[in-house]
Amino acid sequence: RSGKLDAFLVLEQLRCNGVLEGIRICRQGFPNRIVFQEFRQRYEILAANAIPKLRNWQWWRLFTK
């Protein structure tokens, strides 16, 4: 029916798409975002040449928006 939501179906879609798991993780206090410098330090080894080694703060702002 138009304009009607099936609560069970909505909940099932949220569960299947991982939304409920993400909410559960956030409620436990785990961060859902990290700053670019931390991301770069953690994952640089996977693609060392793909992430530029920039020192200019204006460039960092582009990555952290």
From Swiss-Prot:
From what superkingdom does this record's organism come?
Answer: Eukaryota
Q: Which UniProt keywords apply?
A: Actin-binding, ATP-binding, Coiled coil, Cytoplasm, Motor protein, Muscle protein, Myosin, Nucleotide-binding, Thick filament
GO molecular function terms here? Answer: actin binding; ATP binding; cytoskeletal motor activity
Q: Which GO terms describe its cellular component?
A: melanosome; myofibril; myosin complex; myosin filament
Q: Where would you find this protein in the cell? A: Melanosome; Cytoplasm, Myofibril
What domain notes does the record hold? Answer: The rodlike tail sequence is highly repetitive, showing cycles of a 28-residue repeat pattern composed of 4 heptapeptides, characteristic for alpha-helical coiled coils. Limited proteolysis of myosin heavy chain produces 1 light meromyosin (LMM) and 1 heavy meromyosin (HMM). HMM can be further cleaved into 2 globular subfragments (S1) and 1 rod-shaped subfragment (S2).
Biological source species: Sus scrofa
Q: Which family does it belong to?
A: Belongs to the TRAFAC class myosin-kinesin ATPase superfamily. Myosin family.
- List each copy of the Myosin motor domain by range: 1-65
Q: Spell out the subunit comment.
A: Muscle myosin is a hexameric protein that consists of 2 heavy chain subunits (MHC), 2 alkali light chain subunits (MLC) and 2 regulatory light chain subunits (MLC-2).
Q: What is this protein called?
A: Myosin-11
- Which gene does this sequence derive from? MYH11
Chief location: other
Which PANTHER family does UniProt cross-reference here?
MYOSIN, MYOSIN-11
